[in-house]
Each structure stands twice: as C-alpha cells, then as structure tokens.
Amino acid sequence: MPGNPWPHDMVITVDDDSQAVLDLLWVREAWELEPVGDDLPPRLAHGPARVSETVRADASADPVSWQQAWPGLWQATLAHAARPHDPCVFEALGRTDDGSPERRELLGRLIGPRAREDFGEPAFADPAYLEWTHARFQEHMLRRPLNAEDQPERRSLDALIRAWRAGLEKVVAIPCVGTFTRMLGPHTLLVTGETRRDPARYAEALAWFAESR
C-alpha cells in the first residue's frame, strides 16, 4: 500500500500468550516454588493467588520435584518457542494413526514441552488456576490496540525493521515485571510485556538484537 512504512515482505510473528509459558510461570508462583538456575525470568506482573492447603495436601502433588525440574523445563519451553514453524509436521500428522508412536512424536514436536505432562494435573487442580487464567485473558483483551498504528511493533517500527534485516522473525513476550531481554537463537527475541508496551524500551531491545547479530 502506498505510504505504508511497513516493508511489504516483512513478516514478524508475535507470541505474547503462550500457554506453555504461562503455565510454567503460574506453577512457580502459585506453588511458591523457588527454582535455582541460570537466567530464570522475573516474577509475573500480576501474580496468582497461593494454592490452597487442601490442594497442597493431595498425596499426588510433588512441589519438591517440580521445583527441581522447573529450570530445565523453562529452557526447553523457550527453545521450542524459538523453533521456526515447520508446515511439514502438519502434513505428516495426517498420515499417522491415532495413538501411534509416530503421532506422539510429531505432536511433541508441534506442541513442545508442557508443564501439565511433566507435573501432572495435581499442579493445576486449584480453582486459582482458572481464576488467574480468566483474569489474564481479560487483561490481554483489554490491552489489545484498537487500531494497527497503536500496535507495539508499529510504534517501534524503525527499530523493528533494523532487527528484521538482522534476522528477526519472532518476538516472544512474557507477562513478567521489569526488563528481561534475551535472544532465543538467531531469529527470536524474548522480552517482557512491560518492555514491549513501552516504545522506547522496545526500540532499545530491538536495537540490541540487531547489534548482537
């Protein structure tokens, strides 16, 4: 379109609502886990209520092992988020049988690691999980820009274009406090929602990506 500053061939994917990421962040805070590891994310901007004592008393709940597994699962989840989309996986799924090992393997590649599988349903049994998920959805909808020009990528377009020319294809935003800007491989940038909503901070993060490449 004439006069549109967005390059016609620039495609940027923004993932600011990854259920795998949200589930991990919720479990960490609702269960008051204190995982130890390098480069773990900051706390949620709007944290959940603490899991009730009734749910904690469930014999199948194992927060000690969840705490130990959390850092590795976090890194695996980010690695999957940075992986480029492979349309061949969808095609291959259609040629597999329900319940077959091949189908499970392909689904794992498509969906990636999930806290529900690693921690089990007891980790999400508290009603606080649904309450927080609903509140998060409401907040996410309220924050949606009313027009394209108010989108964070549009408000930091110059920096975004430079980052795209340096290889950026995807931005992953997590609903955590403060600044947590990381490169997830050669084509993906991780930022907090706070950073993405602030044009100056977002431009700085995008510039850092471009300079690092």
Identify what each model region corresponds to.
Residues 1-133:
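N-terminal low-structure segments adjacent to metalloprotease catalytic domains
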Residues 26, 33-38, 43, 82, ...:
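Generic alpha-helix signal with a bias toward terminal, lower-confidence helices
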Residues 124-189, 194:
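Auxiliary, metal-adjacent structural segments of Zn-dependent hydrolase domains
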Residues 191-213:
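Active-site recognition of the HExxH zinc-binding catalytic motif
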